[in-house]
Amino acid sequence: DLLLIGSGSGETKTLRVYMEKAKQLGMKTVVFTCNRESALAREAKFSCVIRAQSKFQDGRISVQPMGSLFEQQLLLLTDCITLELARRMNIDFEQLKNRHSNLE
């Protein structure tokens, strides 16, 4: 099993709880974040740093408000990853739907 987490700040407390539980269960963990020094980035097996501002950062990277740029990049990236994994694993969308879990 694989847990994918998206957190611009990399410090979201509820997601840190999920991360800890996943690690206890021996799951692989991946975090997508703007903050390479965050707790989630340190705890994850793999981390992917997205160059965008999170809603908590002061520096402006985009004219878009708060974490919009991060969320848009995360959507595109995870869609590409999902499509490629489904192709490589020969999983159709019905199987994918049945295996998906949203913890929020």
Q: What is each of the regions a protein language model found here?
A:
Residues 80, 86-104:
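A short, charged, Gly/Pro-tolerant segment at domain boundaries
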Residues 1-76, 82-83:
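Glycine-rich phosphate-binding loops that contact phosphosugars or nucleotide phosphates
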